[in-house]
Amino acid sequence: ALYGATFYDVILKDLIPMIDRTFRTKTDREHRAMAGLSWGGHQTFNTVLPHLDKFSYIGSFSGGIFGLDMKTCFNGVFADADKFNKKVNYFFLGCGTEEQMGTKKMVDSLRKLGIEVDYYESQGTAHEWLTWRRCLKEFVPHLFKH
C-alpha cells in the first residue's frame, strides 16, 4: 500500500472504536478531531480528508500535502471551498519559522481556493518538539470553541 495506507484503516476501524469503547467519548463527527506532527500530520490528511463524514477538526504541525494539486488531491476535497468550510469546524496548519517544509505555500494555495485555514508559525524554531508543543497549544483551545 502506498505510504502505509493500511495504517489509516487501522486508525479508522480499530483504534478509534477501541478508544470509544474504553473512554467516555462523543462519537459523532462534530466532536471528532485528528492532528499529527511531521509525518503524523501527513497521516492526518490521509486519514481525515477522505473521511470528512467522521471528522470535523483537522490539525497538522509541520506536516503537509506537498507535490500535489490542492484542487484535485484527495478526490477534489478542496475544490468546493464552501462545502469543505461548512463541513470542517476548524482547520489548523502550523510550523516553525526555520522549517523549509512548504507549509506556508500550502496554506497560500488553500486560501487561494477559498479554504478557511488557520496558520501559525512558531518563531525561531525548526522541525522540532518546541515547534510542535507551541502548535498544540495554539490548536487545542479551538477544539472547545465550536
Residue ranges and their predicted role:
Residues 1-146:
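Non-catalytic cap/lid and distal C-terminal segments of serine-dependent acyl enzymes
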